[in-house]
A protein has these predicted regions:
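Glycine-rich, mobile lid/loop segments that gate access to catalytic sites or pores
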Residues: 1-46, 50
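Phosphate/pyrophosphate-binding loops at sites that engage ATP/ADP/AMP, CoA/4′-phosphopantetheine
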Residues: 2, 75, 112-126
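Condensing-enzyme catalytic core mediating Claisen C-C bond formation in acyl metabolism
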Residues: 8-9, 45-115, 161-175, 179
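Acyl-CoA/ACP chain-elongation machinery
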Residues: 10-24, 93-97, 136-142
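Stable alpha-helical structural segments in soluble proteins, enriched in small hydrophobic residues
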Residues: 65, 108, 112-120, 139-147
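Short, conserved beta-strand edge motifs with alternating hydrophobic and charged residues
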Residues: 85-86, 128-133
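Short glycine/threonine-rich loop-to-helix capping motif typified by GTGT followed
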Residues: 95-102, 134-157, 168
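Hydrophobic alpha-helical bundle architecture
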Residues: 120-130, 154, 173-180
């Protein structure tokens, strides 16, 4: 991924998160503001090259809940239309990056995605919106590729072109993700 790819993801996620009153970081930044601002070195310092401040999620607490129950029970206790889980997947890989052939190769994401799509009878092209784990901008890009939404090397350029923004080909992390 290029610096431009990472900045596109960071600014997109901050913009999406700024729309939510529940966001950890409720502000919008632009890609130009990250890169071209005279204060960019101060406001977006290098943390671990090539990652900068806006490439990482803040250390904070949050919560989400999902209630799993039979559809009939859900209809009886909620006015909302129940969501049916069509497929799921689970996989693990070595956590130690130096033990991987390629540190950006996310085999567990590939395997879990293949399981979920197979169970659901769908393909990545059938997905309209995706929420991916994005503690770092590079993860959103790598996961979008390993889940099959983009070919390897095309996730970052897709973000730069706006394909992962609202109104794009595949909006990713419309909540703002972990970074917002």
């Amino acid at each position: 991924q290029t610096r431009e790819d990472l900045e596109a993801v960071a600014s997109k996620d901050q913009k999406m998160g700024a729309r939510s009153r529940y966001a950890h970081v409720d502000m919008s930044i632009t890609q130009e503001g990250i890169h071209d601002s005279p204060d960019s070195v101060v406001n977006n310092p290098v943390a671990a090259d090539p990652l900068h401040f806006y490439d990482m999620c803040p250390v904070s607490d949050g919560a989400a809940a999902v209630i799993l129950c039979p559809a009939e029970k859900a209809k009886a206790v909620s006015q909302n239309v129940p969501v049916v889980i069509a497929g799921f997947g689970q996989a693990t890989d070595t956590h130690t990056l130096q033990e991987r052939e390629d540190p950006t190769d996310l085999k567990a994401v590939t395997l879990a995605s293949e399981q979920a799509f197979g169970m659901a009878g769908l393909t990545p092209q059938d997905v309209d919106v995706a929420e991916l784990h994005d503690a770092f901008t590079v993860l959103e890009i790598a996961e979008s590729e390993h889940a099959g939404f983009f070919k390897k090397g095309e996730g970052g350029p897709a973000a730069v072109k706006g394909e992962t923004s609202l109104g794009g080909k595949l909006p990713i992390n419309v909540s703002g993700g972990l970074k917002a």
